[in-house]
Amino acid sequence: MVRWLTAGESHGPALVATVEGLPAGIRMTSSDISAELARRRLGHGRGARMSFERDEVELLGGVRHGVTLGGPVSVVVRNTEWPKWERVMSPDPVDPAALAGLGRAAPLTRPRPGHADLAGMQKYGFDDARPVLERASARETAARVALGTAAKALLRQAYGIEVISHVVAIGAVEVPPGVPAPTSLAAVDADPVRCADQATSVRMVAEIDVAHADADTLGGIVEVLAYGCPPGLGSYVHGDRRIDARIAGELMGIQAIKGVEFGDGFTTARRRGSGAHDEIEPAGAGSRRVRRATDRAGGVEGGMTTGEPLRVRVAMKPISSLTRPLSTVDVSTGEAAVAINQRSDVCAVPAAGVVTEAMVALVLADAALEKFGGDSVEETRRNYEGYLKSLVIR
């Protein structure tokens, strides 16, 4: 079983992430993690923090000379701004006199609509939103991307599975039907909004610029694709073992994500059955190989991968920190007020794609090891190849 945890706050000294259950023999370095974290900082519409934020990565355990050892892999992502926040976010008690006059130490009592601020203050009994927003911040996703690097390496090296993402909508601008799905991350990452269609990308950039001029924010939709999945990852026997349920749960756990659909998703609900499913046809005369005429299901049927590309879309809401804040209540006085304005992005949809890749990869790695087992990459690859050879229908 692959398990993962993260710890740390947005302006704390570091984020810490641990993943357990990966086999020995995965080739991975701290440079690989740094490269994935750099991808997370990509995208037109990111805030000022991206211009100076640097993710200092250190592998603390589970890897030796660029190869995993089979034990828990632990990573720390240090906060290069920590000296500015050391007194405000100190884990140990601080003399109030040392905080006096420090602007960033002032209580945050005007919760933002759309953020975790108010519900978190109510749940944990805080009179200040700072403890809530520090952990609820999307900065935490840097730790998940770090762990996803290991999962993506396993999928690629043991099973030949590649996980990529691309942006299909920002605000009201969408990629038109019929545009082929990308197969290369390099081409997607070279685009300013990580869109595979150049004409749509230009319109997306313009949409972001208009929102920025209006002191507003934008959400959008990301599509995640996993190429090379074999049939049979996941199971139909219990709801919590269904691969789509597992993936959807992790994707919905990403900050600001409000919806998930597999394949044609909600569009399928408006079709008749005769036009909603993927017909099965022979892949070649005289063989027992099969293929699908379409991939409307997104590579999942009955909670299991079908062997077609896995395709899942994720809806991200507009960021709730606005430079022209919405109305709220100052909880220290009970009076009407405007929400706090924390430094943030106009649009973080391109970056969200990198986070969704990480979470899909972690779930697929868990499902693949559940199916094929193995304490090393070599062993699980042998088991996987044996499974493919044993398939009566392929």
Swiss-Prot record:
Keywords of this entry? Amino-acid biosynthesis, Aromatic amino acid biosynthesis, FAD, Flavoprotein, FMN, Lyase, NADP
Its recorded name reads Chorismate synthase
EC class, as a word, reads lyase
Q: Which PROSITE patterns match?
A: CHORISMATE_SYNTHASE_1 (PS00787), CHORISMATE_SYNTHASE_3 (PS00789)
Q: Quote the record's binding site residues for FMN.
A: R135, A136, S137, Q255, A256, G302, K317, P318, I319, S320, S321, R343
Task: State what this protein does.
Answer: This reaction introduces a second double bond into the aromatic ring system.
Keyword Amino-acid biosynthesis part of the UniProt annotation? yes
Region of interest (Disordered), residue spans: 270-291
Co-factor remark = Reduced FMN (FMNH(2)).
Q: Would I find Metal-binding among this entry's keywords?
A: no
Annotated Gene3D superfamilies: Chorismate synthase AroC
Biological process GO annotation list? amino acid biosynthetic process; aromatic amino acid family biosynthetic process; chorismate biosynthetic process
Give the matching Pfam families.
Chorismate_synt
Cofactors (names) = FMNH2
Top-level division of the source organism's lineage? Bacteria
So where does NADP(+) get bound? R40, R46
Against InterPro entries, the record matches this protein to: Chorismate_synth, Chorismate_synth_AroC_sf, Chorismate_synthase_CS
Which reactions does this protein catalyse? 5-O-(1-carboxyvinyl)-3-phosphoshikimate = chorismate + phosphate
Pathway assigned to this chain's UniProt record: Metabolic intermediate biosynthesis; chorismate biosynthesis; chorismate from D-erythrose 4-phosphate and phosphoenolpyruvate: step 7/7
Subunit description:
Homotetramer.
Example of a GO MF term = chorismate synthase activity
Offer a single GO CC term for the protein.
cytosol
- Name the Enzyme Commission number(s) assigned to this protein: 4.2.3.5
**Database matches in HAMAP family:** Chorismate_synth
